[in-house]
Amino acid sequence: MPEKWIYWLKELGQENNDIVGKKCANLGEMMKGGFNVPPGYALSVEAYKRFMNETPVTERLLKYLEGFKADPNNVSDTLKYEKASQDIREMVESIKMPSDMEKTVKEYYSELCRIAGRENIPVATRSAGPVSHPGQYETYLNVSGADEVARNVRRVWSSTFNTRSIIARARLGLPLHYDPIGVAVLTMVDAKAAGVMFTVNPVNGDESKVVIEGSFGFGEAVVSGNVTPDRFLVDKVTLEIEEKVISDKGSEYALNPKTKEMEYKELPADKKKAPCLEDREIIELTKIAKKVETHFGCLQDIEYSISASLPFPQGVFLVQARPESVWAKKKKESVLGKKSGMELLFQKAFTPVKVKT
């Protein structure tokens, strides 16, 4: 019997990291924990393998790579990798999934539409690697229609052949033609504001604070660094908003209603320096962040989105959660750097004695 390769997010949990990738597994885990996550489904790494092995993709890739020679550590060879990436991605995206896979992907999308109560709902197709490498692969927003969902899943798969990913594999001595990932197909939130929050102050490592960053529109503006976000510092215990830094945001990442494309558009003058979040939203996000940290048992880096059409607080959604990495790593290094008295004694005992001659 073929291995299962597609799941509703609500079926998943942390234990499924290796099956569907960390992003999908964490979304499912948050659903199980009672957090508000947009409905969606996940294609597993097995789906990637099926696509690569049951279509001509792998055979064509290997043939192409036979003649490819470049040094990943030589900057002058970067153009070779860029050309290879472009050629390979075009190749991958031009080949359709096996017919039974495409049919199933579309059926799951139709069920999402039924749940939402309307046809052709917009979704995001998001990459989900078994190991968390934020920004390594690609995400596509506002994808509507079953055919477009199937096409954009292939685009996510093809992003494993973007230039930086190929170079990274070459440097590690890994096969260039193979890097299985999962894909999340997640219902889009019609975001009036979005961003990221940390259950530790990323500036100084203070674990008694939550830091929320946000901007108007979709969160990609904040995650990508294209907009300087507003920043809110909140005490975890008292829920007091201790600091507000409101930036001149300039633009927002939003849907163009005419072209149906996502784009940056200039904010009206009265919104550029206006806070993107209300106080009640800041406090609600802080409460949620604390619960996510408790649920996962470690400091968290969380992406949120606030709906323009749903009432508060039902419109506050989480679209990503992962362990905070910077201060957790520093804390680990600090602990590893401390030696016990017994360790110091053994170190002294086995230190070679220097003898002058």
List where the protein language model places each region.
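Conserved catalytic alpha/beta cores of large enzymes that bind or transform nucleotide phosphates
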Residues: K209, G214-D301, I306-L310, K338-T357
